Swiss-Prot record:
Gene name of the encoded protein: Ikzf3
Mediates homodimerization and heterodimerization as annotated region, ranges: 450-502
Basic and acidic residues composition bias: residue spans: 33-46, 56-72
UniProt keyword Mitochondrion, yes or no: no
Region (Disordered): 1-85, 370-396
Name of this chain's protein: Zinc finger protein Aiolos
Family note: Belongs to the Ikaros C2H2-type zinc-finger protein family.
């Protein structure tokens, strides 16, 4: 056994340099030291002599050699591959640099250095890719979100969800101060301003404030139209603004000056009628009546209330001296009243010469003629309507129950001495028409009826009635109030309004 131990040591030292034959292993493993090589050479002779000493030495040799080969041979190859991976990044990026997804190509090309993306059609800058895609649908016409009930299509899902509420009738946003309910949050926000005293929207032309932005925009359109009027100079506009600030009645002044420029009014700006009261004038209204500037100021809250207060305050005695001045134009007071309160025109019917026919049924004509009243206002007698005869039959039935008897001159104007001071001006139009026309709904209730005496059209809605009356001209009922087109009769006027050919005739 003593001889076997050196043999085992010799064989183990001989087997160690075997893996060094591989060139890869030379790079990773160091060579044996010089003194170890000398020891091996000195022991080769006794080892060769004792090769046949025993089989145990061969078993030990095979066991150690197999284990060393399994450990040392795979490791240099694996280490060589793994050592090359950290230095192959440039090659990997060069391979992936040419690969781009199709959906990201427009994203990369349209994204500028500032962080926003530009539309390749119109150049609009968008803050995100989703906003850009929604914007591009306006160019392509794509509407992917469609309503399954009516077929309406939308570019965004939020618009579709808002549209669906129209079918369901859902109104989730409710006012905590009243019974108002709406489908959109911004509509509720605008409604809440009506309950507050704050008026955040102010006009830079005249200084008037409004609660709603839409009211301010409508007012600014009227102010711009007045400032751009070529008939008035800059000095007149500045003076008008000073008067406006001093008297606090810019609304009446703007309407007064707009009346002289009716033909230049835009078709997209219908007249706005203020007030909830429904009045009808039983007495004739003569457009020749003129008011002085001191008596012309009205309250800014309710225009209809201001008109009633002015007439009741002045009375017939104050109006008499003004009747004897027919040459004065009617561009000041009459258009203001007719533009804000059109029912006065419908009940009086002064432009088409109908007051003479109407008053014959309820006023006895005297034999004597006053010389001072021979002159008639040109606006009251010069323009005759083509359907005056038809109005005669209708009004005979409407006013045959009236028993008021007043003396009247030949020109159709009643004598102001006989006119009572308290005018009966507060009769609503439905009461005036119920004696002749009755409209009954399905519940059997009598509905309110509003009649246009110029067109012979009945309206069940007061708002539609006021809009229709705003289409009639101030001086001539068959003159379009939006473009100035003059019709020969009510049929041509109705056709003109139905076609809506106003923009081509604007000056």
């Amino acid at each position: 056994m003593e001889d076997i131990q050196p043999t085992v040591e010799l064989k183990s030292t001989e087997e160690q340099p075997l893996p060094t034959e591989s060139p890869d292993a030379l790079n990773d493993y160091s060579l044996p030291k010089p003194h170890e090589i000398e020891n091996v050479d000195s022991r080769e002779a006794p080892a060769n002599e004792d090769e046949d000493a025993g089989e145990d030495s061969m078993k030990v040799k095979d066991e150690y050699s197999d284990r060393d080969e399994n450990i040392m041979k795979p490791e240099p190859m694996g280490d060589a591959e793994e050592s090359e991976m950290p230095y192959s990044y440039a090659r990997e990026y060069s391979d992936y640099e040419s690969i781009k997804l199709e959906r990201h190509v427009p994203y990369d090309n349209s994204r500028p250095t500032g962080g926003k993306m530009n539309c390749d059609v119109c150049g609009l800058s968008c803050i995100s890719f989703n906003v850009l895609m929604v914007h591009k649908r306006s160019h392509t016409g794509e509407r992917p979100f469609q309503c399954n009930q009516c077929g309406a299509s939308f570019t965004q899902k939020g618009n579709l969800l808002r549209h669906i509420k129209l079918h369901t009738g859902e109104k989730p946003f409710k006012c905590h101060l009243c019974n108002y309910a709406c489908q959109r949050r911004d509509a509720l926000t605008g409604h809440l301003r009506t309950h507050s005293v704050e008026k955040p929207y102010k006009c830079e032309f005249c200084g008037r404030s409004y609660k709603q932005r839409s009211s301010l925009e409508e007012h600014k359109e009227r102010c711009r139209a007045f400032l751009q009027n070529p008939d008035l100079g800059d000095a007149a506009s500045v003076e008008a603004r000073h008067i406006k600030a001093e008297m606090g009645s810019e609304r009446a002044l703007v309407l007064d000056r707009l009346a002289s420029n009716v033909a230049k009014r835009k078709s997209s700006m219908p007249q706005k009628f203020i007030g909830e009261k429904r009045h009808c004038f039983d007495a004739n209204y003569n457009p020749g009546y003129m008011y002085e500037k001191e008596n012309e100021m009205m309250q800014t809250r309710m225009m209809d209330q201001a008109i009633n207060n002015a007439i009741s305050y002045l009375g017939a005695e104050a109006l008499r001296p003004l009747v004897q001045t027919p040459p004065a134009p009617t561009s000041e007071m009459v258009p203001v009243i007719s533009s804000v309160y059109p029912i006065a025109l419908t009940r009086a019917d002064m432009p088409n010469g109908a007051p003479q026919e109407m008053e014959k049924k309820r006023i006895l004509l005297p034999e004597k003629i006053l010389p001072s009243e021979r002159g008639l206002s040109p606006n009251n007698s010069a323009q005759d309507s083509t359907d005056t005869d038809s109005n005669h039959e209708d009004r005979q039935h409407l006013y045959q129950q009236s028993h008021v008897v007043l003396p009247q001159a030949r020109n159709g104007m009643p004598l102001l001495k006989e006119v009572p001071r308290s005018f009966e001006l507060l009769k609503p139009p439905p009461i005036c028409l119920r004696d002749s026309i009755k409209v009954i709904n399905k519940e059997g209730e009598v509905m309110d009826v509003f009649r246009c005496d110029h067109c012979h059209v009945l309206f069940l809605d007061y708002v539609m009635f006021t809009i229709h009356m705003g289409c009639h001209g101030f001086r001539d009922p068959f003159e379009c109030n939006m473009c100035g087109y003059r019709s020969h009769d009510r049929y041509e006027f109705s056709s003109h309004i139905a076609r809506g050919e106003h923009r081509a005739m604007l000056k």
